[in-house]
Amino acid sequence: MAHIVTLNTPSREDWLTQLADVVTDPDELLRLLNIDAEEKLLAGRSAKKLFALRVPRSFIDRMEKGNPDDPLLRQVLTSQDEFVIAPGFSTDPLEEQHSVVPGLLHKYHNRALLLVKGGCAVNCRYCFRRHFPYAENQGNKRNWQTALEYVAAHPELDEMIFSGGDPLMAKDHELDWLLTQLEAIPHIKRLRIHSRLPIVIPARITEALVECFARSTLQILLVNHINHANEVDETFRQAMAKLRRVGVTLLNQSVLLRDVNDNAQTLANLSNALFDAGVMPYYLHVLDKVQGAAHFMVSDDEARQIMRELLTLVSGYLVPKLAREIGGEPSKTPLDLQLRQQ
């Protein structure tokens, strides 16, 4: 439960303006970054037909101009590698395409996951839901009401997870309505929101949203999705400070990505940047084996070695848990770092 605080924050219109100011063409993205369109980069153009390219200019501003290997760019730029059909990779790696009701997944005993909205501010090329049938699980009040009725009928649930897409694509008044409905269900104690929007467009943390969280009787956790320290800037730190003041618990989960953050020093820099922003590292996921993203894969042995090195670089509280999600399993599966074998 949080306390009401009045804050000066960006207007609702500001984040919506930034949300609409996006680049959807690979050639334009490369031009903005002063990157010569080499043959390899041009070959990836048609991958936008597999999964649309979408990058807000506010996120592009944090990319290094002239660097085709920029870690933020690599997360969003189409690639010819997306056409590779890799063994063991599928369109539904987590076996999520069977909702208990439209838009609601009950994969874990005490938690249910609501797909609040299908869209995202940015399309990340490694997204494990890039093939998800959002058309069959639309985020609207009718489906939300059906989902809430299911939640109310299942007293084993004590935590709701808002996901997507990105749940913060919902307008402030929609989120306020959802929180009010959840607060009326006695067995729901916590709300966990997984979102990339606060890092992509920090202005999403509006005064109305902060006050909505401040009023809530639920324990609210925000799990940011941030993969590299270069994503973190002053506007993000200010947004997180506003949420901390009203009692929101701030966490982060990352994905271990080839040529983005697959070394210990990069992850140490990320953990330090997160902590400076008041955010605790939570999980580091090995890649979900979604079709079209095999080029981001880091092997388990490499991941363990990176984590063993990370342990020597930062304090223990800055080391995220290395884990993978396996479809059908009742929880995430931690990866043993095999420290005793070293």
Curated annotation (Swiss-Prot):
Q: Which residues form the Radical SAM core domain?
A: 106-329
Q: Which residues carry this modification: N6-(pyridoxal phosphate)lysine?
A: 332
Q: What is its EC number?
A: 5.4.3.-
PROSITE patterns, alphabetized: RADICAL_SAM (PS51918)
Name the cofactor(s) required for activity, per the record. Answer: [4Fe-4S] cluster; pyridoxal 5'-phosphate
Q: What is an example of a GO molecular function annotated in this UniProt entry?
A: 4 iron, 4 sulfur cluster binding
What highest taxon heads this organism's lineage?
Bacteria
> What if the gene is knocked out?
Cells lack CadA activity (lysine decarboxylase).
Q: Which UniProt keywords apply?
A: 4Fe-4S, Iron, Iron-sulfur, Isomerase, Metal-binding, Pyridoxal phosphate, S-adenosyl-L-methionine
Pfam families in UniProt: Fer4_12, Radical_SAM
This enzyme catalyses:
L-lysine = D-beta-lysine
Q: How is the cofactor bound?
A: Binds 1 [4Fe-4S] cluster. The cluster is coordinated with 3 cysteines and an exchangeable S-adenosyl-L-methionine.
Provide the residue positions that the database annotates as binding [4Fe-4S] cluster: 120, 124, 127
Q: What does this protein do?
A: With EpmA is involved in the beta-lysylation step of the post-translational modification of translation elongation factor P (EF-P) on 'Lys-34'. EpmB appears to act before EpmA. Displays lysine 2,3-aminomutase activity, producing (R)-beta-lysine from (S)-alpha-lysine (L-lysine). Cannot use (S)-ornithine or (R)-alpha-lysine as a substrate.
- Report the sequence similarity comment from the record: Belongs to the radical SAM superfamily. KamA family.
Protein name, entry field: L-lysine 2,3-aminomutase
